[in-house]
């Protein structure tokens, strides 16, 4: 008994906080157990004369051990908390599925993390309903695709049965162009555009103004715009400016393009357009601009804001252009079209198709065919009286351009 009391005496100072703080007993008990297992003396019984004095407790070592254990326990608690929240979210989804609510059958880790970030229960239900609708649309599209493929195969088999052996052995003077050859030719045009083509900038600095669904819609329009530009006769040199690494835009683009992202024939940079080009050669295209675009300028650099705005936040791109002290222009929609309903904001793929047509032809009527017909009722028709007035003005201007007493003036008076 004497040996036991003598052994516990050095730890009396450590046992006092243990008795007062019962809530953290698991932490201090683990620390004491670790420290006692490493520092405790042997309990062998000796004679009173040969008994050595007990070892003194090293407070500095005990404090260091306790701090390290607190840090380890904190990290483990954070990881356990994340795992518990993921597990609870999966259980919640499974419970809602059993209750018959609109919940997707398969959900990715990224969608699961986005679901965990939802603040309220109603927000989680809305996001799960959105994923459910997206999954159903994907399945319906896949079924329709399979049905079309089966119909094509049946039509092909029927056509082969109807054709004779002589018709099957026909020779043609034209070589067949395979997809690989077409892609190589389009790639060469893209390389030439990067070296000598006119730049066209997509401003990617609007990811904070959009919801996740709006950002995904914007990236879809960017993919379609890049495809239209790549297949054009004289493509632009596309710039993705203000594209931050690991931003929402960058993650979504890499997710869509996958391994082709590093092979795209375009320039993606974190710099602003004013850092790459002189300000006097930049024109920011925005529907809120008071300046109407009259002709396409081949020596200018046009900027399009990558911004899908369903909440009608008007003036966002115009305010940014004013802050950067950049010239702005808008398309002459009211001059050529009988505008019916809706705002004058166009999608990114519609804008690039209009600009490509203007660049190649310079004809506004041909370029504005890409404006959706649901927004206007047709082109403005100039009346005969207006045409007669224009002709008179042209004649008057031509008459005044000659000197007095010239032959042309006398002939005109006669």
From Swiss-Prot:
Its main location: mitochondrion. PANTHER family: TRNA (GUANINE-9-) METHYLTRANSFERASE, TRNA METHYLTRANSFERASE 10 HOMOLOG C. The keyword Nucleus does not apply. Component of mitochondrial ribonuclease P, a complex composed of TRMT10C/MRPP1, HSD17B10/MRPP2 and PRORP/MRPP3. Interacts with HSD17B10/MRPP2; forming the MRPP1-MRPP2 subcomplex of the mitochondrial ribonuclease P complex. Interacts with GRSF1. One of its GO terms (cellular component) is mitochondrial ribonuclease P complex. Residues 133-171 form a coiled coil. The keyword Ribosomal protein does not apply. Mitochondrial tRNA N(1)-methyltransferase involved in mitochondrial tRNA maturation. Component of mitochondrial ribonuclease P, a complex composed of TRMT10C/MRPP1, HSD17B10/MRPP2 and PRORP/MRPP3, which cleaves tRNA molecules in their 5'-ends. Together with HSD17B10/MRPP2, forms a subcomplex of the mitochondrial ribonuclease P, named MRPP1-MRPP2 subcomplex, which displays functions that are independent of the ribonuclease P activity. It catalyses: adenosine(9) in tRNA + S-adenosyl-L-methionine = N(1)-methyladenosine(9) in tRNA + S-adenosyl-L-homocysteine + H(+); guanosine(9) in tRNA + S-adenosyl-L-methionine = N(1)-methylguanosine(9) in tRNA + S-adenosyl-L-homocysteine + H(+); an adenosine in mRNA + S-adenosyl-L-methionine = an N(1)-methyladenosine in mRNA + S-adenosyl-L-homocysteine + H(+). It comes from Mus musculus. This is tRNA methyltransferase 10 homolog C. Its EC number is 2.1.1.-, 2.1.1.218, 2.1.1.221. GO terms for molecular function: identical protein binding; tRNA (adenine(9)-N1)-methyltransferase activity; tRNA (guanosine(9)-N1)-methyltransferase activity; tRNA binding. The gene is Trmt10c. PROSITE patterns: SAM_MT_TRM10 (PS51675). The modification Phosphoserine is found at residue 79. InterPro entries: MT_TRM10-typ, MT_TRM10-typ_sf, Trm10_C_MTase_dom, tRNA_m1G_MeTrfase_euk, tRNA_MeTrfase_TRMD/TRM10.
């Amino acid at each position: 008994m004497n040996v036991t009391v003598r052994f516990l005496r050095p730890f009396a100072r450590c046992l006092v906080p243990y008795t007062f703080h019962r809530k953290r007993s698991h932490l201090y008990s683990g620390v004491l157990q670790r420290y006692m297992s490493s520092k405790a003396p042997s309990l062998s019984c000796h004679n009173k004369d040969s008994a050595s004095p007990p070892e003194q407790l090293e407070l500095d070592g005990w404090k260091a051990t306790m701090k390290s254990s607190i840090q380890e326990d904190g990290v483990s608690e954070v990881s356990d908390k994340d795992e518990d929240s993921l597990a609870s979210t999966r259980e919640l989804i499974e419970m809602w599925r059993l209750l018959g609510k609109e919940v997707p059958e398969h959900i990715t880790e990224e969608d699961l993390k986005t679901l965990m970030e939802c603040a309220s229960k109603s927000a989680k239900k809305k996001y799960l309903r959105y994923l459910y609708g997206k999954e159903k649309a994907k399945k319906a599209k896949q079924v329709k695709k399979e049905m079309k493929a089966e119909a094509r195969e049946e039509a092909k088999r029927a056509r082969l049965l109807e054709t004779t052996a002589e018709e099957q052995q026909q020779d043609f003077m034209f070589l067949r162009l395979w997809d690989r050859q077409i892609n190589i030719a389009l790639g060469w045009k893209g390389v030439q555009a990067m070296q000598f083509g006119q730049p066209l900038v997509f401003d990617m600095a609007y990811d904070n103004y959009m919801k996740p669904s709006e950002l995904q819609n914007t990236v879809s329009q960017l993919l379609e715009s890049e495809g239209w530009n790549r297949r054009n006769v004289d493509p632009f040199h596309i710039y993705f400016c203000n594209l931050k690494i690991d931003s929402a835009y960058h993650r979504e683009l890499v997710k869509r393009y996958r391994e082709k992202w590093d092979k795209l024939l375009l320039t993606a940079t974190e710099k602003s357009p004013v850092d790459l080009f002189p300000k006097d050669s930049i024109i920011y295209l925005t529907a809120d601009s008071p300046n109407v675009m009259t002709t396409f300028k081949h020596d200018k650099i046009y900027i399009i804001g990558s911004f899908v705005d369903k909440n009608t936040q008007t003036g966002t791109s115009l305010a940014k252009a004013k802050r950067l002290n950049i010239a702005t222009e808008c398309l002459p929609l009211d001059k050529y079209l009988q505008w019916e309903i809706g705002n004058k904001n166009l999608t990114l793929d519609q804008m690039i198709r209009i600009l490509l047509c203007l660049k190649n032809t310079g004809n506004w009527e041909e370029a504005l065919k890409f404006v959706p017909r649901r927004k206007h009722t047709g082109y403005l028709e100039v009346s005969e009286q207006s045409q007669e007035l224009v002709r008179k003005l042209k004649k008057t201007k031509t008459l005044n351009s000659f000197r007095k007493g010239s032959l042309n003036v006398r002939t005109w008076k006669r």
